[in-house]
Amino acid sequence: PDALTLKEAMIYGTGGLTAALSVRKLEKMGAKPEHGPVAVSGATGGVGSISIAILNQLGYEVIAFSGKTEQTEHLKELGASEVRHRDSVNEVGKRPVGRELWANAIDTVGGEYLANLLKQTKAGGAVTSCGLAASAEFSMTVLPFITRGVSLLGIDSVFIPLTDKKDIWQRVATDMKLPDLEKYGEEITLEQTPEYLDRFMASKTVGRYVVNVRG
């Protein structure tokens, strides 16, 4: 879109596109800010951090889940109303359903986190799934689906039609465009990439990184 520079588009990248698709899918299921908070797992990651910022811009209350509690202030600056340790979502344990704690959720990590987000989503709510950093598998009962009408929504940012990609990029360039966008992406050189990949594998990175191949 004309309203985005090339660098701004790369700050969003696939992760930002996935975040925008996740928010849009919740909207299509009827999500509104007045329904209650949206939980976001993997909050300091590329998808999670942009999801928080977009949701906040659209007026939603956000509960951020992260293992990096030292990043609490950063997450609140992005727009999180509350920051909780990621493992607190699993306190529901083996129970088939838990207390209804959020209206909707965006899950970026999979595994038991996805299952337990679903168990604690309010009746009629939805949870999007776009990642598997924790696990590609999860186990739960069907009770959240058949007793609360909770929906599990898959997010695909690769094989969706180009018309859909065009539509969501237009929203990213308009009502979903974040102010001071460059603060969401740290620019690094191509030579620094191996170092940052090591940090990523050690779970020591936060947010988005843009590689300047000419730097």
Where are these regions (language model features)?
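Glycine-rich phosphate-binding loop and adjacent beta-alpha segment
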Residues: 112-178, 213-214
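Phosphate/diphosphate ligand-binding glycine-rich loop within oxidoreductases
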Residues: 1-7
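C-terminal hydrophobic helical "lid"/dimerization subdomain
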Residues: 163-215
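Local beta-strand N-terminus motif with an aromatic residue
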Residues: 80, 101-103, 145
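Short amphipathic alpha-helix with an adjacent loop that forms part of the alpha/beta core around
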Residues: 89-100
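Alpha-helical segments flanking ligand/cofactor-binding loops in enzyme cores
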Residues: 52-53, 73, 115-118, 143, ...
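N-terminal Rossmann-like NAD(P) cofactor-binding module of classical short-chain dehydrogenase/reductase
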Residues: 103-106, 128
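Mid-domain Rossmann-like dinucleotide-binding core that forms the NAD(H)/NADP(H) cofactor-binding site
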Residues: 10-86
